[in-house]
Amino acid sequence: MKLEELSRYGQPLGFPREVQTRQLGIVFNAMRREFGLLGLVPFLVRVLAEQRRIRRAHPDLVAEAGGMGREVETEFVMLTALFRVASDLRGREEAYRFLREIFQAVALHSMPAIYQIDQLAACDGDPFDNFKRFNIAMFEAMNEAGTWTTESVEDDGDRLRIKVTSCANVELFTAIGCPELGRLGCDHDLAGYPVILDRVDAEFRRPCTLAKGGQYCDFNFYRRGTAPPTEHLNR
């Protein structure tokens, strides 16, 4: 199979349909563990009420998220509501920990699906070169969708470096008063990439991100065996 024949080649980043059902199960189980069976229903009632309040209070931000797709809008409102209600009950730090654990559990399933890793690894040609091309096409699609602004793409053979200088998630969550939530995508990647990298002979380094205080997101994909020993510094 040719790389370009993959259904997600050149598509923006998003949770594929097959992951969404699994995601709901992960979220439900996490809420049940966190708040207990007796606390689950009141928590959900508050989250639904908070989602309605967010849509009434911030139609401009909801519309901006919706301009990038219905899925983006739904996730923006839902995550903000979950975080606010959990913060009222547990405090902001614990609320973020709760959502981060959900995102990182989902990442174990979403990252292989986003990259169609079984098919990608079996495509004609060098697996790492195909992985680079898949990333370039995906980042270009995200740039066109307005989700990210990609400043530069550098491919020197054994390393693909992509610098992202703006991120809609960071901007939207900051504007609505929940800047912590901009980090969820970063933490999703930290859990998800290790699941797929061996399949495409790659290593991942990202020393800084916008959501975690950097001037840009510095994505680096190396051919396996050529990356610096700095994985522990990934952001």
What are these regions (language model features)?
Residues 74, 78-80, 85-182:
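Amphipathic interaction/junction segments at domain boundaries or subunit interfaces
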Residues 1-20, 139-157, 205:
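Short, charged N-terminal helix-start/capping segments
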Residues 1-86:
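N-terminal, charged low-complexity regulatory/assembly segments
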Residues 35, 90, 197-200:
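A broad structural signal for alpha-helix termini and local helix breaks/kinks
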Residues 147-176, 180-182, 186, 190-235:
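Short terminal or interdomain "cap/linker" segment that borders an active site or interface and mediates
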Residues 3, 50-61, 82, 129-142, ...:
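Hydrophobic transmembrane alpha-helix bundles
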